[in-house]
Amino acid sequence: MAIAVDYFNLHPEAFRYLYYTPQHGAWFGASPEILLDCDKATDTFVTMALAGTRPVIDDGKPWSGKNLAEQGVVRDYIVDTLYDLGLQPHVGKTETLTTGNIQHLLTRITGHCEGVESTAILSALNPTPALCGWPRAAALEDIIEYERHPRRCYGGYVCVENARSLAAYVNLRCVNFDNAGRWCMYVGGGIMADSDAADEWDETCHKAALLQGLIGGKTESI
């Protein structure tokens, strides 16, 4: 619990969560990525295209073409999916989001969703290309064939719903742990056709660095 609280304190801007289910065990994370936020009273929604990653020390520098293209794929997918549902999304300006020791490219997408169930929007959006690639069906087949480990809850979403609203956040950079002191950390990178393998590895290490620093050598990996 102490490690989770320390991690939460490093991400005050994120959706911070800790949960347990008998089927999936205990998890915690701090997600900056809104998959869907619906206000049921006004029938309005917010989602975002969050992709492209660099260390915070690069703040102020131009974003690389690879990162811009990666984020553009996610943005276009979300917008096209919303149009396919009969919605009229408004696409905001792309900006830089700082979360912990890294930065992402962020485009907020908003609109009205009267007549469309929030669960239908969730099902259509998830998973975005940031989690599974594109085209989605072919990418999911490749993940099933080539990945040697189960993703379990990683890449899904954590959803909080009541009579007034629904908010779902992507389960990114998260940890599965047990009471024996064992931890399994999940992070990922966005690979494009022109990606450099060493750069992608460095990006993944940057994403994992804060969690690794907190967990350190105190525990055993699952």
Predicted regions mapped to residue ranges:
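An anion-binding catalytic pocket shared by soluble metabolic enzymes
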Residues: 1-68, 73, 162-188
